[in-house]
Amino acid sequence: SHFPVTPELPYDYNMDALDSSWQGYFRTFLANRDYDLDISAQTLMKNLRKAYKLPAEWTQEQIYKVISIRYELELRSVPDVGMENYTLATVVSAEDLAAVMELGVPGVIVESGTVREYNTAYAAHLLGELGKLGPDEVDEYLAKGYAMNALVGKSGIEQAFEEYLHGTSGTKYTTVSRSGEVLDQYYTTLPQPGNNVELTIDISLQAVAEDALEKVILDLRENGVGRKKEGKDAEGGAVVVQQCKTGEILACASYPTYNLSTYRNTVAGYNELLEDPYRPFFNRAILAPYPPGSIYKMVTAIAIVDDGGIDPGFIIEDEGLYTRFKSFQPKCHIWSKATGATHGKINLMEAIAYSCNYYFFEAGWQTYNKFRAEAVNPFDTVAKALGLGEPTGVELPEERGTRANAEEKAAQFEGDEAGWYDADVLQAVIG
């Protein structure tokens, strides 16, 4: 039988082990009987039920479970299919283990294996988990020398760094008597451990980010924000904290989330997470493209100064309603017909501080119009240079997102809706 190696552990920024491996008991059934595979599914089920002498009063569910296991055992004993052990149970209690051993069932042996244990309730989306080979993974991993019973990374860091974390499986032979007594065990190939992976994540900061994010989202759902109590429909959110000088990701939180240590404890609990409309398994931090909102004004500000030639001290008077175009007249966020409130005369630095839409409408339009004849979008040029709408280089699967430009719009819409208009420019400059 193939004896899987213990995958090494991902560490956080402070070199604290984020998960560990501990020994659990496995009951394994070794079968070795010839079986005719040239048989229809219906006939197979009928014959197996008779051959296994399953009680007539059993439910269809009970019958299916037992036949599935017994058939798997038979299949594994077929020549050229493989002699991989079949694991009947994992993490068996001492009481159950003793009961099984007392029965002395031939072919049933006990082996110690490794079980991944997570030492933190945080960073579930980042760490990911291990799992058995899926049908679509078997050929790929067998070609790499993996055993059929190998555990591989299924998501997160576990999956992204599988080739580094996973060592080399060993091969162990076990000889048992007819009574089930283990007569001999020996390795022909010793398992070799994999490597550790050091993350830039600071698990303490990650915990602060996740807790704060949860608090904010739940408060939004209950109370909303502002006079209009907006935000009560908040589904989730994300927080990313980077080291400014290096770009290292120190925390990457997504809400809602789940606990890797407990979420599979019960079928009901797991199904509840699967059916949760807020999708706790979805990593919003790197897989969900969102409109940036007013933070995009920083992109516009760079283009205004570097490409538009507008001095940061240039004054524009906020008139509330931007009336340059008859067909589209957006407004500053503090303006309304009832109050007529504006930011008055304002420069670039003040416009950033107060997030004045009007300033960016006017300064942005002047800058865009300067390059109109050249068919150049200065804001898109700056956005691309800053990495927006481009792969970030993070090792986990990510959604690159898009940028607000004529090409992206033409790819997403048809007919008149695919055109790039003055209104699109005004919308783009404020995010």
For the regions a protein language model found, what residue spans apply to each?
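Bateman/CBS regulatory modules and CBS-like beta-alpha motifs in cytosolic regions of diverse proteins
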Residues: V197-Q206
